[in-house]
Amino acid sequence: MTELLQSLSTQNEFVARHNGPNKSDQQKMLEAINAVSLDSLIDETVPAQIRLEQPMNLAEAKSEADMLAAMRKFADQNQIKRTFIGQGYYNTFTPNVILRNVMENPGWYTAYTPYQPEISQGRLESLLNYQQMVMDLTGMEIANASLLDEATAAAEAMTLCKRAGKSKSNVFFVADDVHPQTIEVVKTRAKFIGFEVLVGALDSLPEQDVFGALVQYPGTTGEVRDLTDLIAKAQANKTLVTVATDLLASALLKPAGEMGADVAIGSAQRFGVPMGYGGPHAAFMATRDKHKRTMPGRVIGVSIDTNGNQALRMAMQTREQHIRREKATSNICTAQALLANMASFYAVFHGAEGLRTIARRTHHMTAILAAGLTKGGFELAHNSFFDTITINTGAQTEDLYAKALAADINLRKLGTQLGVSFDETTTVADVEALFAVFGVKEEVAALSTEIAGNEFAAIPEALRRTTEYLTHPVFNTHHSETQMMRYLKQLENKDFSLTHGMIPLGSCTMKLNAAAEMIPVTWPEFGSIHPFAPADQAAGYAALAKDLKEKLCEITGYDAFSLQPNSGASGEYAGLIAIQRYHESRGEGHRNVCLIPSSAHGTNPATASMVSMKVVVVKCDEEGNIDVTDLAAKIKKHKDNLSSIMITYPSTHGVYEEQVKEVCEMVHAAGGQVYLDGANMNAQVGLTTPGFIGSDVSHLNLHKTFCIPHGGGGPGMGPIGVKSHLAPFLPGHIENGADGENFAVSAADMGSASILPISWAYIAMMGEAGLTDATKVAILNANYVMEQLRPHYPVLYRGSNGRVAHECIIDIRPLKEETGISEEDIAKRLMDYGFHAPTMSFPVAGTLMVEPTESEDLEELDRFCDAMIAIREEMTKVKNGEWPLDNNPLVNAPHTQFDLAKEEWDRPYSRELGCFPSKATKSWKYWPTVNRVDNVYGDRNLICSCPSIDNYED
């Protein structure tokens, strides 16, 4: 290629669009922080002993058009068939009003978890609707705001049963009619907690001495049976019973709660979320009110703001890993908020009557198929069903299965039986095609007429739902597309996302989620593939996964990857399991001590506890580094039982620890393994790797470094990379040929496969040079912010040359002593200036951790720094007595439009200062919709269901 052609190429355009500061602005920033060049800044920041000697061996950057063309080749290798496999995954129609206005809308998918409720009221309302939907359909008293998938929800339910129950047994019963993938994930969780799993016939449950039980309703083979007596008998034996159920079936069937279930779990996938080869989808958990504080996951509750107006928030956060650490109810952080919102809106759009019609149509099609097959001489395994039937096909099984495949139809093979599951997309033509496969001559119309006289004959009368559901006005208002569009926009407008401004959350990497990366996610070639379809139908997914894993190995210095974990916490869990299985394979299963620095994220100790490790905390020194002397003492004390150490790099204190290789060597010398948390991988890519540093295993947060959007609290992905000696211990899956114990951690082999194209696209469009440049710019942005703020705020940790990594910690503690203003006051005041707050009080209480990422431009960085400096000046006015401590712009923040419109203004500062505190806010203003939320009131007066419509009107 000539020099001119090269200069005109679009090949590297994306890098400049992804990174915020252009070359000219980068030079200004370097001058401002007294750095000669970007490379010299990196030399001053990143220890020489961990720097890579060679660049990564990755392909050159692709243009957006070339990337999409390459992605199309992957997609075209997938084959969309008529799929009737079921097993927890179903085709569904995503209402286009939801597809366009939520799934494809950065206002919804770029928001963060709603820890700052004043700027999150929209998605909090939607998630509250989700909880109400789940409670109504399951007949339970309280629900959470989503879990990762149905199988992990079942594993979480098992631990809830143990915590909440009174049985002294250590055995958990699983009915053999539970989905196979769920059974395997439950077995994994049980093994490492120390529970025994007993898989048996459902009717044997009352005889068992078990602390908990898991049953499926309808069963995996489709049978619908009354569980009421079985549940009562089990509960009489101190057994808590979890029912894995189906939300659409619950529109017609007696719900699990009315049969006495203690816990109900399942997946909301079929409520408008594509199968996507396994995910992401929102799982749900609902339980009795008395178990609410042992229920894992986020729970949305109703509270009030400082003016007494209704406000929503995340409730009961003291249960969660970021507070309780190794004593938490679960290690779950990121759940599936975006998918829960889609399912919630599906229920809002259709309403109770719409859902009932969809359920009736699905059931009627199934009843027609069952009647035709029966008349055609086939025997059904059971005659009570909702949407799934199992046919005893005997010696004909293989031939019929092959005949179906030849007709582009996927059935479920169950030994000498074939399973068929219908859904809302099933048509008369589908039924006729199945009749042709089975050689049935019956007419669909005639069968429909025959069934119409007793439409629900296949549902025993005692199991037909009689109670109402989705009666709240929100489910009975927005049924035209105009109404729905406006409701979605109304909620979106309440929330702060990357469409509004920088979200400088430390340790969260809220970088650009580029439109080109997102486009393939909605292609049907990725969305319409069943996770258990024959492998040749998912060849595109296999090729994409293989290439992505190779790229991730190159980026991390690892030898093998698993894409199965569907969150960062799940990746941690899979990584520690790999370590423990490795020790067991060497006859050292007694190694159970996990060393964790005091600065670690709360998931680390919570995850270690989930694999029955003993957590031993290692001190950090005054510079934020691991205290090597204390580490040596802890290693010496626990040498014989040392399993591993969990570290984060750069550390959660925002510095590159110079002795990190020494730390790894010390642990290895004592027979331990090194787990390097990949949360801060955005500061490593192209400069160093976990493998080069000396780590044995890491998870990567693809929703941080590799551009999968946070979705307002999920989805995420946490694939794990390992050195070769740990590769045999990566999670397997029954649907991928794993025999015996497979140690699955997710319901599907490839986890949340349909969002993998996002990360592949990012890597492809950045190329080696672009990825490395992004890391350097992230470090530049963080150091620029740090130097701008340092004259006004104490910076807690810096490296030996005075630099920080990709984030910095601002210490508010001495300023609070001096002025009385807290880190929370600053966080809330930033909303008035048009910003989401930095991370509060992590990893050090009383601090703010700022991570600007590489995607923020100089103008936005300056706007943030100007806001922080102005807030510091406001603090000084409080200190000097110009404003009282209990009545000033900081403690009254955030300010709303209602404040601006008040007839009386009893504050010692102007309306303008309160509501438009900067020049930038006068040209464009984001408005919080509620004042500061009262967290204490919300937990003392716990309401986790939709409040009366009167509350919204007030």
Swiss-Prot record:
| One example of a Gene Ontology biological process annotation | glycine decarboxylation via glycine cleavage system
Q: Where is this region: Disordered?
A: 1-24
Q: What cellular-component terms does GO give this entry?
A: cytosol; glycine cleavage complex
Q: Which domain of life is it from?
A: Bacteria
GO MF entry, a single one:
glycine binding
Task: Give the reaction(s) catalysed.
Answer: N(6)-[(R)-lipoyl]-L-lysyl-[glycine-cleavage complex H protein] + glycine + H(+) = N(6)-[(R)-S(8)-aminomethyldihydrolipoyl]-L-lysyl-[glycine-cleavage complex H protein] + CO2
Q: Give the E.C. number(s).
A: 1.4.4.2
Residues with the modification N6-(pyridoxal phosphate)lysine, per the entry, are K704
- Cofactor(s), by name: pyridoxal 5'-phosphate
The answer to whether keyword Coiled coil applies is no
Question: What InterPro entries does the record tag this protein with?
Answer: GcvP (IPR003437), GDC-P_C (IPR049316), GDC-P_N (IPR049315), GDC_P (IPR020581), PyrdxlP-dep_Trfase (IPR015424), PyrdxlP-dep_Trfase_major (IPR015421), PyrdxlP-dep_Trfase_small (IPR015422)
SUPFAM superfamilies assigned: PLP-dependent transferases
Q: Where is the composition biased (Polar residues)?
A: 1-13
According to its UniProt entry, the function of this protein is described as: The glycine cleavage system catalyzes the degradation of glycine. The P protein binds the alpha-amino group of glycine through its pyridoxal phosphate cofactor; CO(2) is released and the remaining methylamine moiety is then transferred to the lipoamide cofactor of the H protein.
- Subunit composition and interactions: The glycine cleavage system is composed of four proteins: P, T, L and H.
What's the protein called, per UniProt?
Answer: Glycine dehydrogenase (decarboxylating)
